[in-house]
Amino acid sequence: MFDSDVLDRDPGARDNFFAQLSHVAEGEFSAPRHRHDFEQFRFMLEGEARFREGKMVSGVLGYFPEGAYYGPQDRTHGSVLIVQFGGASGNGFVDRKVMKVAMAEMKALNTGVFEDGLYRRNPGVGGKPVQDGNEAIFEYIRKRPVAYPKPQYLCPIMIDSSAIAAFPVEGLEGVEERHLGTFSSTRIRAARYKLEPKASLPVHERGIYWVLSGSGAIDGAPYRRLTALYLEQGEQAAFKAAEASDILYLGLPRLELIRTQEAELPEKAAAAPQNGSPLDEASATAG
């Protein structure tokens, strides 16, 4: 839905991100216990995702901090909104298309096999015999071990958005907000907004706004269920509801609060094909 190609952004920037709507069939996906050097939000639209830390069902938002272990994930089915992004560490987020190219190159080398979210090296090949698949790809791309930051949160946070009270937004008639949380030192915010018919919601925070239900217009352009809007820092827009609307906001880090180190990417990344996901897990729920 959103990546560096769609938005014409630098895939090597420390504020790079990826967003998609994933549909997963019963029994199609599982993942071992692992961690990442980036952060992610997941919002379940329908179905369930079961982790050791808890079960996500419709309306549950998961925040997965950089550096924190989670899983295993042994059951996932349904539809989930996913946003993956570089966190406070400044490690950035390796672009999906870059990972797809790297995975293809690793397969061509025939030094191991990708299986069940893991990379299993052939006997006699240097490196860990068994390694998290994404980690192996990151190390191939960056030509160095993955540097996991010390997690600011020790485990994922799962929020039942329907259990959080909604309050009127001051100065905005017909608009209520459920504040789902503010996370990390980069002040990532998440919220849900309920708009009555004819209500208006001006927005200006960096991040992605997903329409969960309803219809109307964004600055005159029509919106409907699953319309998504991305705002860069400093941009603004306004939702005008034609019918009752439910809008999910998933914020991204404030740029000035990200450590000033650029993600390392190979020069060949610029020529990589679009819309790639490295593992089955990435194309399904990007574990």
Segments from the language model and where they lie:
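Jelly-roll (double-stranded beta-helix
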Residues: 1-43, 48-287
